[in-house]
Amino acid sequence: MTLRTLFLSATFSLLSASVALSASVSVFKDAGCGCCGGWISHMRENGFAVSATNVAPEIMDVVKAKAGITADTASCHTALVGGYVVEGHVPASDVQRLMDERPDAIGLSAPGMPVGSPGMEGAGAEPYDVLLIHRDGRTEVFASH
C-alpha cells in the first residue's frame, strides 16, 4: 500500500465517521419498549447523536402515518435522521449508507422486529431485509442481513 493510498483511506474513514457524528437522530417510541433502547444504544455506539421521545401508542400511529410508514413497513419505533424516516431496527451501517447516497426516498424500514437485528439480538438470528421506501410508497430491498 502506497503512502498516498494509505492517506486517502484514512481521510475517507475520518470523513465517513464525521458524517455519522454530525447526524442527529430523533426517535419516537413507546415508553415500555425495551428493544428500542437497544437500537438507540447501537446507533450511539456507531457515532450517531440520538434523542428519544416516549409517546402513547395512539400518537405513534399518527407519527408513523405522517412519516409515510404503512402497516407493511411498520416496526416498533420511528426515527427521523437527515430528512429521512428510519423505521425499526435498521443497522447503523444502512443508515450511514442512506446518508451517504441520499436517494430520493422517504427512508428505510426493517419491518416487524427481526431477531438478530440491532436491539433484537438473541439466539436464532433470522435473515431480514431493510427496505428503501420510495416517495410513491413502493419498496425495494436496500440491504439484506
List the predicted regions and their residue ranges:
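Thiol/selenol-based redox catalytic cores and closely related redox-interacting motifs
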Residues: 65-145
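Stable alpha-helical elements in mature extracytoplasmic
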Residues: 32, 39, 56-59, 91-95
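Conserved helix-turn-beta segment immediately C-terminal to the redox Cys motif
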Residues: 40-58
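Structural motif
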Residues: 59-65
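Active-site-proximal beta-strand/loop segments in catalytic clefts of secreted hydrolases
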Residues: 28-31, 53-55, 89, 111-113
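Local sequence-structure signature of Cys/Sec-based thiol-disulfide redox active-site neighborhoods
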Residues: 22-46
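Second-shell loop/turn segments in exported
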Residues: 28-30, 49, 81-86
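Bacterial N-terminal signal peptides
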Residues: 2-18
